[in-house]
Structure formats: C-alpha cells, structure tokens
Amino acid sequence: MRNSIENSIENSIDYDAVVFDMDGVIFDSERAVMQCWKELAEKYQIPDIEQAVLSCTGTTMKRTREIMLETYGADFPYDTYAKESSAIYHSRYDGGRLPMKPGVVELLTFLKEEGKKIALASSTRRQTVTNQLRDAGILDFFDQVICGDMVERSKPAPDIFLKACETLGVKPEHAYAIEDSYNGIRAAHAGKLHPIMVPDLLPETAEMQEKAEVVLPDLLEVISYLKGDRHGI
C-alpha cells in the first residue's frame, strides 16, 4: 500500500475507469443511518448498537438482517426496527437532503474531463441508489450503476466490481475502486481492481493498509493522487 501521492508516478499503465461505492463515499449516509439506529437503541434499550451497525457496513439488506439476528438472537424484531429506522431516515433525507461527502462533484468532474469511465457499485438496492443520485444531481456522471440486487454474491465477494468493469468494458486491472468499508476494499482487492480507501466510520486497519493501494483522507486527495498517477496504475 502507498499512503501518499509522492511515489505514485512510478507507474506506467493508463487507468480506464473508476468504480465508486456510494454510502460513506459519495453520501454521508452511513453516519445518518447510525444516528437513526442509535435513536432506536435508546428507545428500545438495544445494547451495543454502534458495533452491530458497523458490522453491517458495506453489505446488502439481506446480509444486514442476518448479521443483526446473529448478533441479537433469532427473536430480535429486526424487521420492525428496520422499518422504523428507515422511516426516520427517509423523513430526514429524501428529496436531495442527504449530504454529499466533500469533493464528490470535483472528482466526478475531473474524471469526465479526463475521459475516464465511471461506475457505481453499491450494495444498496437499485431504486434507492438511482433516486439518491438523481436527487443529488449527479446521476448523469455515471456510465453504469451496479447494485446489490443485480449480483448473486455481495461484498466482500468481488462480483459487483467485476460486473461494473464488465459493463464498462474495461479490465479490472485498469480500474480504481473507491471504498470506505472493509468489505468493499476486500471485494475490490479480490477482483484485482486497485482499491483506494477513503475511511468514513471505519478506521483503516493493518489489513486495509495491505489490501488498499492507498488510504486517503477525502475525495479531494483522490484527485491529487490521480493527477500524480495520471500515467497509470
């Protein structure tokens, strides 16, 4: 892993595409979801909710349900709580009110100006993804949108990243993946993409330092990294 941009120009193969995760990378949604669950935890006296929610980061709704039941037991009323949490979330953030992470538009604009292909690979359902990107005014930046309900295996399996590269018509080895979650970095690494970790709620770990090509603090630093790495991966 490289954790700075100074030595990035040593590479020589052009990159063709960048594949983005959505929650925690484009939108500050994971923090919003966490807050909703914290409110439910206080209301219903659910213990250790923060760690439980963090364990679900980067997974599909199906896997999230499984993790919650594994954590709290088969009689945990997850469906009821999830419905209430979702209602709180949508009442606050629908209609373009979900805040974007700093540097999103700048990075997307840079990639378009560079002629790079752009895809989104999110474990979230397609309709939700499309609505959020459209409401934020950035849907048209993406050449392809691949979602969790379009692949058989969720992250950390590489399926969603491989499908994104396939639909873009690029080799995984010639694509960056921008992720904030451990499962996302694992998936991109397994798929032979070049993972860039931009941590959100989850801090970098020794495993992430090993699997990510670079760990950067925000998307504006990703622009600097790609400019330094203009000639390739």
Tell me the role of every PLM-derived stretch:
Residues 32, 56-60, 99-103, 124, ...:
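Short beta->alpha linker loops
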Residues 47-50, 68-106, 114:
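Metal-dependent phosphoesterase signature
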Residues 2-5, 9-54:
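Active-site neighborhood of HAD-like aspartate-dependent phosphohydrolases
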Residues 2-16, 109-112, 125-233:
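Asp-based, Mg2+/Mn2+-dependent phosphohydrolase catalytic module
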Residues 40-41, 60-75, 132, 164-165:
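Helix-loop "lid/cap" segments that line or gate small-molecule binding pockets
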